[in-house]
């Protein structure tokens, strides 16, 4: 066990930093190069996007989970420094992951693509880093590209973000250029962690993973004090205590250690059995010498998008619950509660941070846990003011009160920042207008790029805004949004009736202006998807009692006259009447099977079809 002096000297050598960048600006590649350069990973084990350990991350080329890795770097001054690289996601839905990892750092490397310049999400993450008082080191990456223009990007960093970019490193993570300069700048510019080894333990939980053998493993950043195997730790939010069975660091693989001291980033295993006992953002302290107060954690992220998740096989309901609990463990922002639907049976109403988050969760459930799912149309949280003066928060269309009880409805608006090349400004404005957006401001970043700011209803964004934005700007636009306010809107709930019965899972909320078109579109779409029955099935779209659109699926009929060659007309009529009576009886008791595509079709309604 080293003495206090040695620990303090070691603390001087620690550098905690993360890498922030927009998607595809080369963040994971840079992390790979840093791992190679510091010889943390042997060239035999090296693979591209090493830190993106989920298959899903590799395939989509995005970082979803954060990772924390310890590296040793021998600097030019002859000293060996301990680096903790905390890898962060770049996508707007994972901002909370970014804020968690930045809370564990003192510095951040800002990677900007030399050809593309600053993008909307780069800005969003930089502001998070500035809020956390981090030292920011700009790096202009991909300088070996033919289209690279490092000087333009340098002035952009200075003008748009206001950082001094005169010492920005020009690098190419792919070709391995400039990596050493980056490492030297980390040593010089990123401050060593503040904190006192002798103070009572305070460690911030920034992530947790579930291990079937060792229980919940916490990833922590030690802010004050130290923790070692055999200590009794206590969670400050709920006072529960556990015995530490193992502490250690990640070099991507977990490596056991005797202790973690101030400034260290590593893991603590304490045979914690239940997921609920450890909340990300909580403070760990020692039971026999607790800290006076917890560290300020993160702001609790509230889900913005809700959808119902139902297992296709109803006996998988419990498996789905267990899977969601496991995902919730290291994704504190996922919320879920049980719900039932007449059409789909038992399932869960889940809350997500955004569409990508929803997609990723759905895909992880299907892949990692082998559960086939039906997902209902995503909706947002509405504020419904009733006639008797109550305010209800409703996230599920089927929970909307009767139209006669509703006084006003408010829906969430977001402030959307869209960065786009000048020639696509028209297309972006047209799209935003069509999505009921209100124009706020527009500013030119340089001769060619424009930052357009709109207030847009979140309900329109969760629908298909991102895909539409990408296709109308040929993929050049980048987009970031944050919740701004609730506004009163003319909204109505639309029900879909099949054979006179409401299908609760197909209900959705729509603006009164688009109600007729949307209703017409859906009934036509369902007509194509729902197979023909033995009897005629009317499909109707209704607002309250009023039917706004209708179409019929024609019945399949057998030719009952085939066996009458000639014969009297009354004989034929008798057979037809008999068939008609049979169909009528069938229709009265018949129920219509709704295929899964029908639910999905409500999701994927194209504007162009409107």
From Swiss-Prot:
Keywords: Cell membrane, GTP-binding, Hydrolase, Membrane, Nucleotide-binding, Protein biosynthesis. The keyword Hydrolase applies. CDD domains: EF4_II (cd03699), EF4_III (cd16260), LepA (cd01890), lepA_C (cd03709). InterPro entries: EF-4 (IPR006297), EFG_III/V (IPR035647), EFG_V-like (IPR000640), EFTu-like_2 (IPR004161), G_TR_CS (IPR031157), LepA_C_sf (IPR038363), LepA_CTD (IPR013842), LepA_IV (IPR035654). Its EC number is 3.6.5.n1. It catalyses: GTP + H2O = GDP + phosphate + H(+). GO terms for cellular component: plasma membrane. Its main location: membrane. Pfam families: EFG_C, GTP_EFTU, GTP_EFTU_D2, LepA_C. It comes from the Bacteria. GTP binds at residues 24-29, 141-144. One of its GO terms (molecular function) is GTPase activity. GO terms for biological process: positive regulation of translation. It is a peripheral membrane protein. Signal peptide: none annotated. It is found in: Cell membrane. Residues 12-194 form the tr-type G domain. Required for accurate and efficient protein synthesis under certain stress conditions. May act as a fidelity factor of the translation reaction, by catalyzing a one-codon backward translocation of tRNAs on improperly translocated ribosomes. Back-translocation proceeds from a post-translocation (POST) complex to a pre-translocation (PRE) complex, thus giving elongation factor G a second chance to translocate the tRNAs correctly. Binds to ribosomes in a GTP-dependent manner. Belongs to the TRAFAC class translation factor GTPase superfamily. Classic translation factor GTPase family. LepA subfamily. This is Elongation factor 4. It comes from Streptococcus thermophilus (strain ATCC BAA-250 / LMG 18311).
């Amino acid at each position: 066990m080293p003495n206090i002096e040695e620990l303090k000297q070691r603390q001087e050598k620690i550098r905690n930093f993360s890498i922030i960048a927009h998607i595809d600006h080369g963040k994971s590649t840079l992390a790979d190069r840093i791992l190679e350069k510091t010889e943390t990973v042997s060239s035999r084990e090296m693979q591209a996007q090493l830190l993106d350990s989920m298959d899903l991350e590799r395939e989509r080329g995005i970082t979803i989970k954060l990772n924390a890795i310890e590296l040793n770097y021998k600097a030019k001054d002859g000293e060996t420094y301990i680096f903790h690289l905390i890898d962060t996601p770049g996508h707007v839905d994972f901002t909370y992951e970014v804020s968690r990892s930045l809370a564990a750092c003192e510095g951040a490397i800002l990677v900007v693509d030399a050809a593309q310049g600053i993008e909307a999400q780069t800005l969003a993450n930089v502001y998070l880093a500035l809020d956390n008082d981090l030292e920011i080191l700009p790096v202009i990456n991909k300088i070996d590209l033919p289209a690279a223009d490092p000087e333009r990007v340098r002035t952009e960093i200075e003008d748009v973000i206001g950082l001094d970019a005169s010492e920005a490193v020009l690098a190419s993570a792919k070709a391995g250029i400039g990596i050493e300069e980056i490492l030297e700048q980390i040593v010089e510019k990123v401050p060593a962690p503040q904190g006192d080894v002798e103070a009572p333990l305070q460690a911030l939980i920034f992530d947790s993973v579930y291990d079937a053998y060792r229980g919940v493993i916490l990833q922590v950043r030690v802010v004050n004090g130290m923790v070692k195997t055999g200590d009794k730790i206590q969670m400050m939010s709920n006072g529960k205590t556990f015995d530490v069975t193992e502490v250690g660091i990640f070099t991507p693989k977990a490596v056991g250690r005797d202790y973690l001291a101030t400034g260290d980033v590593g893991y603590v295993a304490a045979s914690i059995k239940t997921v609920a006992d450890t909340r990300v953002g909580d403070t760990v302290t020692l039971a026999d010498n607790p800290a006076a107060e917890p560290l300020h954690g993160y702001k609790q992220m509230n889900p913005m998008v809700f959808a119902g998740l139902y297992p296709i096989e109803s006996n998988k309901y419990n498996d789905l619950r267990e899977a969601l609990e496991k995902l919730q463990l290291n994704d504190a922002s996922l919320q879920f509660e049980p719900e039932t639907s007449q059409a789909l049976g038992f399932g869960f109403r889940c809350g997500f941070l955004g569409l990508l988050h929803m997609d990723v969760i759905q895909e992880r459930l299907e892949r990692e846990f082998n559960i086939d799912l039906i997902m209902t149309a995503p909706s947002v949280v509405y504020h419904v003011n009733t006639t008797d003066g109550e305010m209800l928060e409703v996230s599920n269309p089927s929970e909307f009160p009767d139209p006669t009880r509703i006084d006003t409805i408010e829906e969430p608006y977001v402030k959307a920042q869209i960065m786009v090349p000048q020639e696509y400004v028209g297309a972006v404005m047209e799209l935003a207008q069509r999505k009921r957006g209100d124009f706020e401001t527009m500013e030119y970043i340089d001769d060619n790029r424009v930052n357009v700011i709109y207030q847009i209803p979140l309900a329109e964004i969760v629908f298909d805004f991102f895909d539409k934005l990408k296709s109308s700007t040929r993929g050049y636009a980048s987009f970031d949004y944050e919740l701004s306010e609730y506004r009163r809107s003319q909204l109505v709930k639309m029900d879909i009736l099949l054979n006179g019965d409401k299908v609760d899972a197909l209900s959705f909320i729509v603006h009164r202006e688009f109600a007729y078109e949307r209703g017409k579109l859906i009934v036509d779409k369902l007509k194509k998807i729902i197979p023909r029955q033995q009897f005629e099935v009317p499909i109707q779209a209704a607002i309250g009692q009023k039917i706004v659109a209708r179409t019929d699926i024609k019945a399949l009929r057998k030719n009952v006259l085939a066996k009458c060659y000639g014969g009297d007309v009354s004989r034929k009529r008798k057979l037809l009447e008999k068939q008609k009576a049979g169909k009528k009886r069938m229709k009265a008791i018949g129920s219509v099977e709704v295929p899964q595509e029908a639910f999905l079709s409500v999701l994927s309604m194209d504007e162009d079809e409107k």
